[in-house]
């Protein structure tokens, strides 16, 4: 008896790194693929992953510098080749790696003449420097220079305020983004309904994380963002005959409408047009297409009526109420 082999497509998603290189101490590159994906899924994942890579991953930066010898951040100090502003800019570019929480202090204390590099920074145990050769300043005379530093771990970026200084300490623009760039592209294959996609993801980092580490952290952050949706306590709306209609998060629409009517019953709702409410364009167009032209028309509809409107969402109901209560 000969048994014929049957091919079964399990559609198990697989990802792998197809290219990895270190261009310098402060530039890593990685290229990854994820497949097989159904049509449209690659773009969904690619956009979300790129945003998570660029905005959700924490990094470590020097955020403040302090020295008794610095009168202001655009001054020059005798015996130092660079201006104070240039020194602060150089400190801004120092790439650090850490697992710290909150802020830590660091110190530079050197005697000239000579070059000051990242190697001269005395760091707390939880912080390390990626490139010890990064230049900070040049001392041209035998002077002592001590600079106190504040180190923070955060995400995104923090821009210094022009007058944000304390006792001769100066804020430094901080970019807490270990991922310098991320791109995604899509390759489609197959025919008709069997069409599938491969997602290509390219990641460049500053060396404080490898692209693979960045991909893992971005993935974890995305998962954590979506976990709450798995545990939402749903409340069920019922019609008057108790037949099940729809399951949605409950907004106290009716009670808020009653309060609105009590507060504004002296006003003629039929003379207030929705054009006057400054609604977002999409909500305005949805209401107009449903022949809702005045505030009276709007308030005569229940929450259930409104969410039946094409392209109208439960969040739009809350948005309308928020706008009305401010009027």
UniProtKB/Swiss-Prot annotation:
Subcellular location: Plastid, Chloroplast
Biological processes per GO annotation: DNA-templated transcription
Region Alpha N-terminal domain (alpha-NTD), annotated ranges: 1-233
Principal subcellular localisation of the protein: plastid
Region (Alpha C-terminal domain (alpha-CTD)) location: 266-327
Highest rank taxon of the organism: Eukaryota
Catalytic reactions of this protein: RNA(n) + a ribonucleoside 5'-triphosphate = RNA(n+1) + diphosphate
GO CC terms of this entry: chloroplast; DNA-directed RNA polymerase complex; mitochondrion
Pfam families, per the entry: RNA_pol_A_bac (PF01000), RNA_pol_A_CTD (PF03118), RNA_pol_L (PF01193)
EC assignment: 2.7.7.6
SMART domains, per database record: RPOLD
Keyword entries, A-Z: Chloroplast, DNA-directed RNA polymerase, Nucleotidyltransferase, Plastid, Transcription, Transferase
Record-linked InterPro entries: DNA-dir_RNA_pol_insert, DNA-dir_RNA_pol_RpoA/D/Rpb3, DNA-dir_RpoA, RBP11-like, RNAP_asu_C, RNApol_insert_sf
GO function terms (MF aspect): DNA binding; DNA-directed RNA polymerase activity; protein dimerization activity
Entry text on domains: The N-terminal domain is essential for RNAP assembly and basal transcription, whereas the C-terminal domain is involved in interaction with transcriptional regulators and with upstream promoter elements.
Functional summary from the UniProt entry: DNA-dependent RNA polymerase catalyzes the transcription of DNA into RNA using the four ribonucleoside triphosphates as substrates.
Family under the similarity heading: Belongs to the RNA polymerase alpha chain family.
Self-association state and partner proteins as the record states: In plastids the minimal PEP RNA polymerase catalytic core is composed of four subunits: alpha, beta, beta', and beta''. When a (nuclear-encoded) sigma factor is associated with the core the holoenzyme is formed, which can initiate transcription.
Name listed for the protein in its UniProt record: DNA-directed RNA polymerase subunit alpha
Organism in which the protein naturally occurs: Barbarea verna
Gene that produces this protein: rpoA
């Amino acid at each position: 008896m000969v048994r014929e082999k049957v091919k079964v497509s399990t559609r198990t998603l697989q990802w792998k790194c197809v290219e990895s290189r270190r261009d310098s101490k402060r530039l890593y590159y990685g290229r990854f693929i994820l497949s097989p994906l159904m049509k449209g899924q690659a773009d969904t994942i690619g956009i979300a992953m790129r945003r998570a890579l660029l905005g959700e991953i924490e990094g470590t930066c020097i955020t403040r510098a302090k020295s008794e010898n610095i009168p202001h951040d655009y001054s020059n100090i005798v015996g130092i080749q660079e201006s104070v502003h240039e020194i602060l800019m150089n400190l801004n570019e120092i790439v650090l790696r850490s697992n710290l929480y909150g802020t830590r202090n660091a110190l530079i204390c050197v005697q000239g003449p000579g070059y000051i590099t990242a190697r001269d920074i005395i760091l707390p145990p939880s912080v390390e420097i990626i490139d010890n050769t990064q230049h900070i300043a040049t001392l041209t005379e035998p002077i002592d220079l001590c600079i106190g530093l504040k180190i923070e771990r955060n995400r995104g970026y923090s821009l210094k305020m022009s007058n944000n200084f304390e006792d001769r300490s100066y804020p430094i623009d901080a970019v807490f983004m270990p991922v310098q760039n991320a791109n995604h592209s899509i390759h489609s294959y197959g025919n008709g309904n069997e069409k599938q996609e491969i997602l290509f993801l390219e990641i460049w980092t500053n060396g404080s994380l490898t692209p693979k580490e960045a991909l893992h952290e971005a993935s974890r952050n995305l998962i954590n963002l979506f976990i709450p949706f798995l545990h939402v306590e749903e409340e069920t709306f019922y019609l008057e005959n108790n037949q099940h209609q729809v399951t949605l998060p409950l907004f106290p629409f009716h009670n808020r409408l009653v309060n609105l009517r009590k507060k504004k019953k002296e006003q003629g709702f039929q003379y207030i047009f929705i054009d006057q409410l400054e609604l977002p364009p999409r909500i305005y167009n949805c209401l107009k297409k449903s022949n809702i032209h005045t505030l009276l028309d709007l308030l005569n509809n229940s929450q259930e009526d409104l969410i039946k409107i094409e392209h109208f969402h439960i969040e739009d109901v809350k948005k309308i109420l928020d706008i009305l209560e401010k009027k």
